From Swiss-Prot:
Keywords: Cytoplasm, Endonuclease, Hydrolase, Manganese, Metal-binding, Nuclease. Belongs to the RNase HII family. Its EC number is 3.1.26.4. GO terms for molecular function: manganese ion binding; RNA binding; RNA-DNA hybrid ribonuclease activity. It comes from Rickettsia rickettsii (strain Sheila Smith). One of its GO terms (cellular component) is ribonuclease H2 complex. This is Ribonuclease HII. A divalent metal cation binds at D21, E22, D112. Disulfide bonds: none annotated.
Length: 193
């Protein structure tokens, strides 16, 4: 059965609706990135779905289309701030900043997952990146943005293979940590080895 990815956007059809998602909650290194997207219901880009279900090439293509056609914003919270305030609070902060940075003020903000926000505009949707087009679009922007950041950091610290693992705790990444120790970009609050 085909899921109507505009179901939630249609539910709030008289409102400006933003979708928000993050990338980088689980990695051992690098920032967490949140992106907010307001989809233009009169200009639907085909192929948008949860970033994890797309090839890198398709994500990059959709990134260009989304950023060229929709209102969007991104927020990045550093690994040091993640260590200072914890990953959940860092993610919430990134989400709030991304929404605040949009060129249009949304009346409803659809959020992937079950995070709770004090802002009453935020509506949490479990599995939202598979159920809402605007959340799926935000997942693509967040993932591509973070992957590009980790690619840049990988040039500085190639031994951790961030160009391949994006900072996640793969076997090779953990082996590199055991050999080389932690880089300045590793999250100290994450127990990895």
């Amino acid at each position: 059965m085909e899921v109507d990815l505009l179901h939630f956007e249609k539910k709030y059809h008289n409102c400006i609706v933003a979708g928000i998602d993050e990338a980088g909650r689980g990695p051992l290194a690098g920032p967490v990135v949140a992106s907010a997207v307001i989809v233009d219901n009169a200009n639907i880009i085909t192929g948008i779905k949860d970033s994890k279900k797309l090839s890198k090439k398709k994500r990059e293509l959709l990134y260009e289309q989304i950023t060229s056609n929709y209102a969007w914003a991104t927020a990045i919270i550093s690994h040091t701030e993640i260590d200072d305030i914890n990953i959940l609070e860092a993610t919430k902060k990134a989400c709030s900043i991304a929404v605040a940075n949009l060129s249009l003020e949304p009346e409803i903000v659809l959020v992937d997952g079950n995070m709770q926000f004090k802002d009453e505009r935020f509506v949490s949707i479990i599995n939202g990146d598979n159920l809402s087009l605007s959340i799926a679009a935000a997942s693509i922007i967040a993932k591509v943005t973070r992957d590009r950041l980790m690619l840049d950091l990988s040039a500085e610290f190639p031994q951790y293979l961030w160009h391949k693992n994006s900072g996640y705790g793969t076997k090779e990444h953990i082996e590199a940590i055991n050999i080389h120790g932690l880089s300045p970009y590793h999250r100290r609050s994450f127990r990895c080895c």
